[in-house]
Amino acid sequence: MMMSVVAVMAWGCSTDHDSDDRYDASIRLSELPDTAREFIAKYYPGAKISHVGRKGTVTTTAYDVEFTDGAEVEFDATGLWTDVSAPRGKAIPTGIVLPAIDQYVSGYYPGAAINEIERIIPSGYEVDLTNRLELIFTQDGTFLSSYD
């Protein structure tokens, strides 16, 4: 009996290591970098969080926060967002995207909204719209290309 309790406790542990030294761990919101917690407080006030995790390898760390409505935010080791996504067909919170990108999207795609934005280091941003079109922008928000 004691052996099965220990096995269940070990199986239920929140850290998972795999063969290439990657790990995934559930963590508390308070364990996120300050910058990430401030981002969540600013853009997702009152939102219910379903999961907070830390992932990476021995040399890199990243964090992810999942909300009960299906939204998700990924952060780098310093707490800077790297990917922000809303549930399918919904828009991410306003204010996250550079004004130049917002203006481009509203000017050229007035019926669409930004569903996801990914920071592409070092070149810029990939933006997915609710109409399923994907746009690429430079770091300063200059439009580069689109594809679907």
Where are these regions (language model features)?
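Flexible "stalk/tail and boundary" regions
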Residues: 84, 99-106, 116-118, 122-125, ...
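Sec-dependent N-terminal signal peptides
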Residues: 1-7
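Post-signal-peptide N-terminal segment of Sec-exported extracytoplasmic proteins
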Residues: 29-70, 74, 78
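Amphipathic N-proximal alpha-helical interface segments
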Residues: 61-87, 128-148
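Short, non-transmembrane alpha-helical segments in secretory-pathway proteins
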Residues: 27-49, 92-115
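Bacterial Sec-dependent N-terminal signal peptides
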Residues: 7-30
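A cross-family detector of function-defining hotspots
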Residues: 50-66, 113-130
